[in-house]
Design a protein with these regions (language model features):
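Catalytic-core environment of secreted peptidases
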Residues: 62-81, 89, 104, 108-109, ...
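His/Asp/Glu-rich mid-to-C-terminal helical/loop segments that flank catalytic regions of hydrolases
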Residues: 432-507, 514-515
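Short helix-loop-beta-strand segments that form the rim/entrance of peptidase-like active sites
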Residues: 84, 223-226, 312-336, 359, ...
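N-terminal hydrophobic or amphipathic helices/low-complexity stretches enriched
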Residues: 21-98, 103, 108, 272-275, ...
Length: 515
């Protein structure tokens, strides 16, 4: 592996690009080790063996808040380009975040082997868009992630043509789709497949309408030649239009998307203890990037900062098992960093990871203490034991908790698909707090758990300090437990049937729908 000095780190993270409305991974580049220009040797003999209570006691909200203030300043460096603070992939705010994480780890001496894993990504930015359906501007229209622009980045006009079934087969597209705008129902196949089908049939653009009332935030996936400009609209507007078309009414449409698709480089940052059994590693991570719409201080500044603070405090101890920390890039664009890492592990390296713990959004203002409801029947063996560790800790603190399902929206996904036990905790995103949850956790029923999820207001005021400190202590407990021993934890096994069943149930891959 190439060794880079700390002084060369900025050059290593010189990432060029623009706001990513969509992004997709490309082939592997191996991790490269980094070394500090003033590396300090660590005397392990003087350190006590890892102890959960001691590591938890080292966590303070004051230290976390200081890191949050730095993250917000990083986001502010993007204001000139984006018009507001952001740490989105490709921005100076994200570049500064990566440098800060890596430099903080390098300053800890040789306790960790710090490395970066570089990979190219295709990202797209939508600058302007407009969709007119039957002489009315669509209020729910959202361009699909990684959509190409309309021809010549100009408006295109045509009749709306209702596609048969769900537009998953070539036979679903009537001949009169050619030169017009395809109107396609969501379901049965991926959005990208629908766009390809419409493109091959000669449509100028495609509109996919939801079967649910909600807006349709989706992605086409890796760009291919036959993709055409594609929108998603909500089910209320979609049903109204579809019913009229089904009744034989003629409706026209105007579609316009000005978008750019380009490729940049980004990195995952990794740190593994030099000490501890390298064949039995506990791994944990959060994502380093945010969305273009805001600074991303809770999502996932909170999780990535919690993981970093635990990494810093862990250096006070010696460990029996290796601990591997990760800060994933491009999570908001489809879990690309964690997918990239997990999919390219050799079989030998895969088996060394005993479990992966995902920490995404630790400080939602209207929080609930959430645990992924992993079971060994539906996830790799060990996932249930990890779930129970979180349950036992919350109970020991006299705290309530609630279970949430795996839904494919965070970085545990790639590990489960790779057969690695996984789980995690969270405090909630756009889910509405129930009355029962209000009684369990306080806050306000009827409001989002994070009212600023994926918005400009996800700033320093969008952090619940109580939840953040509590959950960071739980992260410390999870690390300390497995850094000490895997006694009673299932050994790794290959579980292809479980992995296959998991993959077939996911409609999300990251924050956006894929089908």
């Amino acid at each position: 592996m190439a060794v880079l000095s700390k002084l060369a780190l900025a050059a290593s993270f010189a990432l060029c690009g623009v706001s990513a409305a969509g992004i997709q991974q490309q082939p592997l580049t191996a991790p490269s080790s980094l070394s500090s220009s003033h590396e300090t040797a660590v005397d392990y003999s003087s350190k006590p063996l890892i102890d959960s209570e001691a590591l938890q006691n080292a966590i303070s909200i004051d230290a976390l808040v200081k890191r949050a203030e730095k993250f917000y300043k990083f986001a502010q460096t993007s204001e000139e380009e984006y018009g507001h603070p952001t740490r989105v992939i490709g921005s100076s705010g994200h570049e500064e975040t990566l440098n800060y994480i890596a430099n903080t780890l390098l300053d800890l001496g040789d306790y960790y082997n710090v490395s970066v894993q570089e990979f190219p990504v295709t990202l797209s930015n939508v600058f302007q868009f407009r969709l007119v359906l039957a002489d009315e501007v669509s209020k729910s229209a959202i361009p699909m992630g990684l959509t190409p622009p309309t021809k010549d980045k100009e408006p295109v006009h045509g009749d709306l043509v209702l596609v048969k079934n769900s537009g998953c087969n070539a036979s679903d597209y009537p001949k009169n789709v050619k030169g017009n705008i395809a109107f396609i129902r969501r379901g049965e196949c991926a959005f990208g497949d629908k766009s390809i089908g419409a493109g091959k049939a000669g449509a100028k653009a495609a509109v996919i309408f939801n079967t649910d009332p909600e807006e349709l935030h989706g992605t086409l996936g890796l760009p291919v030649e036959d993709h055409i400009a594609t929108f998603g609209i909500d089910g209320v507007e979609g049903k109204k239009i579809a019913d009229k078309l089904a009744d034989g009414e003629s409706l026209d449409a105007i579609a316009y998307i000005d978008a750019e698709v380009k490729q940049i480089q980004t990195v995952n940052v990794l740190a593994q203890t030099e000490q501890g059994d390298p064949d039995n590693c506990v791994m944990l991570g959060g994502h380093s990037d945010g969305v273009a719409e805001g600074p991303g201080i809770n999502d996932d500044g909170s999780g990535s900062m919690s993981v970093l603070e635990v990494a810093v405090q862990l250096t006070k101890f010696k460990v029996n098992n290796c601990v591997r920390f990760a800060w994933w890039a491009a999570e908001e664009e489809g879990l690309l960093g964690s997918d990239f890492y997990a999919e390219n592990l050799s079989e030998e390296e895969n088996q060394k990871i005993r479990l992966f713990m995902d920490y995404d959004m630790m400080a939602s203002p209207n929080f609930a203490y959430q645990i992924y409801n992993a079971t060994n029947a539906e996830s790799p063996a060990g996932s249930e034991e990890l779930r129970n560790l979180y349950v036992d800790w919350y109970k020991s603190q006299g705290l309530n908790y609630t279970f949430i399902p795996f839904d494919g929206r965070s970085d545990y996904d790639g590990f489960i698909r790779a057969g690695i036990p996984a789980g995690g905790i969270a405090t909630g995103a756009e889910a509405v707090k129930t009355k029962e949850e209000e009684e369990m956790f306080g806050g306000h029923a009827g409001q989002w758990l994070d009212p600023c999820y994926h918005q400009l207001c996800d700033d320093l005021g969008n952090l619940n300090h109580t939840a953040w400190e509590v959950n960071t202590k739980l992260i410390a407990h999870s690390v300390a437990t497995f850094a000490l021993s895997f006694e009673g934890f299932p050994k790794r096994e290959v579980e292809s049937e479980t992995i296959s069943a998991y993959g077939q149930t996911m409609k999300h891959h990251g924050p956006k729908l894929i089908l």
